[in-house]
């Protein structure tokens, strides 16, 4: 894994994206050389480089939006072909819309077909080569765990079930004396002469410390320091979860980690960058989704007025504001007078509302809240004060998520299902804490792309 602007990214996925970007850029030049190889004709695009860059970026965006950089690195030819076809179809639709606005980007019909054919072929070949390389043991992270308790069990499960381009190999666990074991016996390793000697023996690339009580006399402080000085990376469980799951886990969190763990950028430059991103992204989304907003008039036909729904939510620093949404539930949804979480197949949701929720159309009016500065485009979802007071009482550090503005979309929304319980709130909080700690323009852009994938797939709606 590599860290870009505080966010962990799979090294293999990053390399694949760069290779495919270069290949797509080259495909336009190759297609042009082949098309005009007889010396006749001319290139219709006024700027070959700008047109090629536009083509490459749109295709990369389309593949990202359909999850092409998130899935298993061991896909075969058939699966690769199946997944690439809709990506290029989406790219074709987006390019057609761009060309309608900027005709000078048009390559010409014949050469465009050739560019798409060369580009798609190049992507397939690139992926097959990279997928094959990803199976090499040389590219695996070899993990040695110190501790064999419940925390070690959770870390090992995460490492073992990790999919995508980042592969891990669990060497085993070295439990401390007197520690209760929660890991399989097959993974238990006896302590050798020293941790450093064992790390070198098993060729460990990293040692993960999963010991909850670090004040114990059995905690091997000197040996861990020896490993760090010997060139073996040593991290704790909190850092491991943050890197591998994009979560700050509550079960491994210590207050000192939030205070001294870095991140939490609230500088003027970050605030100005985020505000600019909010205005630009919200403006573009508003323009692109005007037809969808007009379609929400179907609410009137099914259930009458009002079309819009205003509700008090908790914003930054606990301030209350009124969020604006398209109404997706019956007008008497809370006739009992008590706020209630939406449930699976909630009968209060109207037929039109169910479609709007699936496509996230009901969230679009919140652009008004973004323009007013009450919300950001990306951030933790704002909750109702009734639920916030309950969750702050039941969940430690829940109030930390209110350190930044809430968002229309967020890391928890693209990584986790729709939440409707305290347990779900804890899971989502772990993603929210990660975002609050590591938020950046780069992470906002990644979440924006992932949001497109969520909308297209209809995941997480109720």
Regions found by a protein language model. Give the residues of each.
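Signature of alpha-helical transmembrane segments in polytopic membrane proteins
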Residues: 1-138, 274, 462
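N-terminal hydrophobic signal-anchor/signal peptide
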Residues: 1-23, 27, 74-76, 125-287, ...
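Membrane-spanning helices that line or support transport/gating and their immediate boundary helices
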Residues: 33, 128, 132-136, 158, ...
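Membrane-cytosol interface motif
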Residues: 84-88, 139-158, 306-329, 351
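Short, glycine-rich, amphipathic interfacial segments at transmembrane boundaries or analogous
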Residues: 179-181, 238-242, 247-251, 309-348, ...
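A hydrophobic, helix-centered structural microdomain
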Residues: 269-332, 369, 446-462
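A short, structured surface patch at a secondary-structure boundary
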Residues: 342-405, 447-455
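C-terminal terminal-structure detector
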Residues: 386, 393-462
């Amino acid at each position: 894994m590599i860290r870009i602007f505080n966010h962990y990214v799979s090294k293999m996925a990053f390399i694949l994206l760069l290779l495919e970007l270069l290949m797509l850029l080259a495909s336009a030049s190759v297609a042009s050389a082949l098309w005009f190889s007889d010396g006749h004709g001319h290139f219709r695009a006024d700027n070959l480089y700008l047109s090629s860059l536009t083509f490459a970026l749109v295709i990369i965006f389309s593949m990202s939006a359909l999850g092409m950089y998130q899935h298993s690195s061991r896909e075969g030819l058939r699966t690769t072909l199946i997944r690439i076809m809709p990506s290029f179809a989406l790219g074709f639709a987006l390019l057609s819309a761009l060309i309608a606005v900027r005709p000078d980007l048009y390559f010409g019909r014949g050469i465009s077909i050739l560019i798409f054919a060369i580009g798609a072929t190049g992507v397939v070949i690139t992926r097959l080569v990279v997928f094959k390389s990803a199976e090499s043991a040389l590219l695996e992270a070899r993990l040695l765990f110190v501790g064999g308790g419940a925390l070690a069990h959770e870390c090992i499960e995460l490492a073992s079930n990790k999919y995508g381009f980042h592969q891990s190999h669990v060497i085993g666990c070295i439990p401390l004396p007197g520690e209760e074991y929660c890991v399989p016996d097959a993974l238990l390793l006896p302590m050798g002469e020293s941790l450093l000697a064992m790390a070198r023996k098993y060729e460990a690339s990293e040692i993960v410390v999963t010991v909850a009580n670090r004040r114990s006399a059995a905690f091997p402080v000197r040996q861990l320091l020896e490993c760090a000085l010997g060139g073996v990376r040593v991290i704790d469980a909190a850092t491991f979860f943050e890197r591998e799951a994009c979560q700050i886990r509550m079960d491994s969190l210590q207050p000192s980690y939030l205070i001294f763990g870095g991140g939490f950028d609230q500088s003027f430059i970050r605030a100005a960058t985020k505000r600019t991103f909010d205005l630009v992204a919200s403006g573009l989304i508003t323009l692109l989704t005007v037809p969808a907003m007009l379609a929400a008039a179907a609410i009137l036909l099914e259930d009458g007025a009002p079309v819009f729904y205003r509700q008090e939510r908790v914003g930054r620093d606990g301030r209350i504001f009124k969020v604006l949404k398209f109404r997706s539930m019956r007008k008497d949804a809370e006739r009992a007078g008590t706020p209630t979480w939406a449930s699976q197949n909630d009968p209060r949701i109207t037929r039109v509302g169910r479609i709007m929720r699936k496509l996230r159309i009901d969230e679009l009016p919140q652009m008004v809240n973004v323009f007013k500065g009450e919300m950001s485009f990306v951030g933790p979802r704002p909750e109702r004060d009734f639920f916030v007071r309950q969750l702050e009482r039941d969940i430690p550090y829940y109030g930390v998520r209110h350190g930044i503005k809430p968002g229309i979309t967020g890391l928890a929304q693209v990584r986790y299902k729709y939440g409707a319980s305290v347990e779900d709130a804890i899971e989502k909080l772990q993603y929210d804490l990660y975002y609050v700690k590591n938020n950046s323009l780069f992470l906002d852009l990644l979440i924006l792309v992932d949001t497109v994938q969520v909308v297209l797939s209809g995941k997480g709606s109720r």
